[in-house]
Swiss-Prot record:
The protein's name: FMN-dependent NADH:quinone oxidoreductase 2
Stored InterPro entries: Flavodoxin_fold (IPR003680), Flavoprotein-like_sf (IPR029039), FMN-dep_NADH:Q_OxRdtase_AzoR1 (IPR050104), NADH:quinone_OxRdtase_FMN_depd (IPR023048)
Keyword Acetylation recorded: no
Gene: azoR2
HAMAP family xrefs: Azoreductase_type1
Molecular function as annotated in GO: electron transfer activity; FMN binding; oxidoreductase activity, acting on NAD(P)H as acceptor; oxidoreductase activity, acting on NAD(P)H, quinone or similar compound as acceptor
Cofactor(s) this protein cannot do without: FMN
Catalytic activity: 2 a quinone + NADH + H(+) = 2 a 1,4-benzosemiquinone + NAD(+); N,N-dimethyl-1,4-phenylenediamine + anthranilate + 2 NAD(+) = 2-(4-dimethylaminophenyl)diazenylbenzoate + 2 NADH + 2 H(+)
Source organism of this protein record: Bacillus cereus (strain ZK / E33L)
Function: Quinone reductase that provides resistance to thiol-specific stress caused by electrophilic quinones.
Cofactor note (record): Binds 1 FMN per subunit.
Keywords in alphabetical order: Flavoprotein, FMN, NAD, Oxidoreductase
Disulfide topology: none
Pfam families tied to this protein: Flavodoxin_2
Family named by the database record: Belongs to the azoreductase type 1 family.
């Protein structure tokens, strides 16, 4: 039985946030098509994960060197391990998030920091870093109210680009990406843009 991990990084309700609606649509469509799959859903805002900083980094280093950890470091390392192992054990992963202020919401950056661990999702070699998580099937769902398809705007899109870059670093070089954009910039076509985008989400979910 496949293990599927759904990761949502938006705490706004689906009726107010397109990426939340994309997530909801994908999950419901996938569950309907795959009733016997083992599914785990992570709502990153609800988890309120501690920032990845000195305590977790020092704890990870000390553990790798066989050094004794403080209680605080033990707790931080255990939290990182929990989510890292969950990701590594998943056969399929879906990320859903908006573009806020040109990038992803902060909880997703924290979560990705937990996952980006040398020896686990990538390793260092003489020829540079090498990804270790390439066997996973991944879908990226992104929403942005403005249209970032133009030559002027494209470099400012640091949400989907950030996530797919990190995935590539981990060896996941071909994630399927669905983006809904421009629904705020083009209010006269907003409903059509969202509806067509959600149809694409359903198609991807049905065959995932």
């Amino acid at each position: 039985m496949s293990k599927v991990l759904f990761v949502k990084a938006n705490d706004r309700p689906a009726e107010q946030a397109v990426s939340s609606k994309m997530y909801e649509t994908f999950v419901n469509t996938y569950k309907e098509a795959n009733p016997n799959t083992e599914i785990t859903e992570l709502d990153l805002f609800a988890l309120d994960l501690p920032y990845y900083g000195n305590i977790a980094i020092s704890g990870g280093y000390k553990r790798s060197q066989g050094m004794e950890l403080t209680a605080e470091e033990e707790k931080a390392v255990a939290t990182v391990d929990q989510y890292l192992n969950q990701f590594l054990e998943a056969d399929k992963v879906v990320f859903a998030f908006p573009l806020w202020n040109f990038t992803v919401p902060a909880p997703l950056i924290t979560y990705i920091s937990y996952l980006s661990q040398a020896g686990k999702t990538f390793k260092y070699t003489a020829n540079g870093p090498e990804g270790l998580a390439g066997g996973k099937k991944v879908v990226v769902l992104g929403a942005r109210g403005s249209d970032y398809s133009s030559e002027q705007m494209a470099p400012m899109e640091m949400a989907v680009n950030y996530v797919t870059t990190v995935l590539g670093f981990w060896g996941i070089t071909n994630p399927e990406t669905v983006v809904i954009e421009g629904h705020n910039q083009y209010p006269d076509r907003s409903q059509q843009i969202v509806e067509e985008g959600l149809e694409n989400v359903k198609k991807v979910a049905a065959k995932f």
